[in-house]
Structure formats: C-alpha cells, structure tokens
C-alpha cells in the first residue's frame, strides 16, 4: 500500500536482532523516536525489548551473542514482551504523531525495514516506502567531503536500539549543518 508521506515528521527506527537474516533471525529490541523536520524529538520515544524464540537465541553466532551480552541486552530478554505486543506498542507510539506515511529514518535502515516488514507488518503498513538512510549520506561525505566526515560524531551506542536511534538523529543533524548546506 502506498501512503502519502507526512511532510514534516521523521520516524527514527533501530532494531537489534539475533542476526541479519529476517527469514531465520528475530527481533530482540526496537526503539522509535519521532522528530520534526528540524530533527527535534517530539518526546522520549518508545523502546521495547522483545522475547525471541529459544531457537533464534540458540542459532545466534558467537559474534552477535557476544555483542548482545556486552551491551546487556541478553540479560533483559527474560523481561521481554512477545513480538505481537511489541508491534502494538510501536504502532501506538508512531500513530500518536503520524497517522500514516511516516518516513522511516536511521542508519543502514534497509535491514531494520526488512525485520519490521516481517515481524511488525502493522507498523510497516503505516510507513511510507521512502526512507532516510543516514549511512548513505555518510558514504557521500566519505567520498566528496572527507574533512566533514572526519568531524562527524563518534558512535557510542553499544548496539542498544534507543542509543543508536539518538546517535543517528545527531549524526544527520551534523551532516545537515556541515554538509547539506548549499543554496540553489
């Protein structure tokens, strides 16, 4: 379904998963913050820890398991909610600010979108097909303005969804101020 985008608000999303393949891996954590066109958060957002299947947890490779152990996420999974409940919470949060057509935003957002599409189809249905991927802007800065790229904020989120969302917003704000400043 193609819905018209909401012109000013951006729906920032980050997911933590058991791996990168939505056909076999599952969601562990989802964070969403809605901002206005000036990248100012409308509120604190929503962060949900999801309870994955024991099969998905057991299939995590060592690198991913270590990453989620160090971040503390694995310790929180016992208090996670079913993905259906997480979907309802995320949808309720988004529709508080954007009825339909929210532009999904974040870093390397295509992977997050695949997981949202598979595990949260009701959320996917209210998002526009367009996306703002900060990592694409970063790649342009690397090639066209390395001096600007070198001044970009360092990421410290430690693979936790809300920290990653907030860092992505800050990173786009940096590129907006320093890189996307031309006039026509």
Swiss-Prot record:
This is Oligoribonuclease. It comes from the Bacteria. NCBIfam families: PRK05359.1. Belongs to the oligoribonuclease family. The active site is at 129. GO terms for molecular function: 3'-5'-RNA exonuclease activity; nucleic acid binding. 3'-to-5' exoribonuclease specific for small oligoribonucleotides. It holds the Pfam family RNase_T. It comes from Tropheryma whipplei (strain Twist) (Whipple's bacillus). The gene is orn. Keywords: Cytoplasm, Exonuclease, Hydrolase, Nuclease. It is found in: Cytoplasm.
């Amino acid at each position: 379904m193609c819905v018209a985008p909401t012109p000013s608000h951006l729906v920032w999303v980050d997911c933590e998963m058991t791996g990168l393949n939505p056909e076999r891996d599952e969601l562990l954590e989802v964070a969403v913050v809605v901002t206005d066109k000036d990248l100012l958060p409308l509120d604190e957002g929503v962060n949900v820890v999801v309870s994955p299947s024991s099969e998905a947890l057991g299939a995590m490779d060592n690198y991913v398991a270590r990453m989620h152990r160090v971040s503390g996420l694995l310790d929180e999974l016992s208090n996670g909610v079913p993905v259906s409940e997480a979907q309802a919470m995320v949808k309720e949060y988004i529709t508080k600010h954007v009825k339909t057509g929210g532009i999904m935003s974040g870093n390397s957002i295509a992977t997050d979108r695949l997981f949202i599409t598979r595990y949260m189809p009701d959320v996917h249905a209210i998002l526009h097909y367009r996306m703002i991927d900060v990592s694409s802007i970063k790649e342009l800065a690397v090639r066209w303005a390395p001096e600007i790229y070198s001044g970009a904020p360092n990421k410290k989120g430690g693979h936790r969804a809300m920290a990653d969302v907030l860092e992505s917003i800050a990173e786009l704000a940096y590129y907006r101020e320093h890189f996307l400043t031309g006039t026509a």
